[in-house]
Amino acid sequence: MHALTTVENPSARLLPGVLALIRDVEAADGHEVLEAHRWIDLANADAESLHGIAVTLDDDTVVGYVHLRRHHRHGIELELLVAPDHRDEAASIVGALVEAASASLETLGPHEIFAWVPRHSRQVIDALEGLGFRADRAVRQLRRPLPLESDHPARPIDCPPFRTFRPGEDEDAWLEVNNRAFAWHPDQGDWDLETLLARERESWFDPAGFLLAEQDGRLVGFCWTKVHAPRSSSALGEIYVIATDPERAPRGLGSCLLVAGLDYLAHHDIPTASLYVEDTNERALRLYDRFGFVVDHEDVRLVWRLPAAS
């Protein structure tokens, strides 16, 4: 068992170690860690972002990291990372991270703390459950190879034309449809203009891959794509957000938008498409199953209530 030290808000001295940990976890687990909004928080010092806590060995090797983020609807969110070659010590590392996080949050009073565990890491989940957390949500990443076959049985025969998103013009209409379509969703349903503009400032943002459907001059649906590592052999396309207006969209528009997004990614030589979906969203899961998507991995959220300070 190694001696562990917790460091709040890691300084520039430890930042390379945090980044190395992230790269190691991504290489071991095969997908990106720290969701996009957490990276944006860190880059922009977002007011909703609290801070990060690292766990180090005596030689300053970073073996664990947690990013804390205040969510106005869901208490405090944590995302925990444990170094792949130290996961046999997950109980100790996670315990140190949660203890430090709890101490830093005591002044907030009783709060629910939500911990995201990427790729359903069994060691990390066991460690959290041992501390009293319980699983309450799971998000699946689905993937399928590209291109979608021209004669694929799920490909719609007749689809309307789509246009691309116009930055500076389409934000209000898009926010209205997005928030109405995702009113039920814990993360996607309450975006505001700054949330959208922060995405537009990201290096990956490309309005050419942000497709809009209109009917009688009104926005009724969209498919927003994203490309990870676009110039590498591991390039991965993502259907980042897709939705139709629940009040106005014609039947079948969702399938047409999905195909348009897949075709856009394939046209740019992306070999694989991915998307995220709640494991309880049976309607969406049935749609993606028809198009040949399969589960790549599952991210799990666990919850624990921070007690009142004594």
UniProtKB/Swiss-Prot annotation:
Acetyl-CoA 2 binds at residues 242-244, 281-286. Its EC number is 2.3.1.189. One of its GO terms (molecular function) is protein-N-terminal-alanine acetyltransferase activity. Acetyl-CoA 1 binds at residues 80-82. InterPro entries: Acyl_CoA_acyltransferase, GNAT_dom, MshD_Acetyltransferase, Mycothiol_AcTrfase. 1D-myo-inositol 2-(L-cysteinylamino)-2-deoxy-alpha-D-glucopyranoside binds at residues 187, 226, 238, 276. Pfam families: Acetyltransf_1. It is an enzyme of class 2 (transferase). GO terms for biological process: mycothiol biosynthetic process. It catalyses: 1D-myo-inositol 2-(L-cysteinylamino)-2-deoxy-alpha-D-glucopyranoside + acetyl-CoA = mycothiol + CoA + H(+). Keywords: Acyltransferase, Repeat, Transferase. Residues 5-155, 160-309 form the N-acetyltransferase domain. Monomer. Belongs to the acetyltransferase family. MshD subfamily. Catalyzes the transfer of acetyl from acetyl-CoA to desacetylmycothiol (Cys-GlcN-Ins) to form mycothiol. NCBIfam families: mycothiol_MshD. This is Mycothiol acetyltransferase.
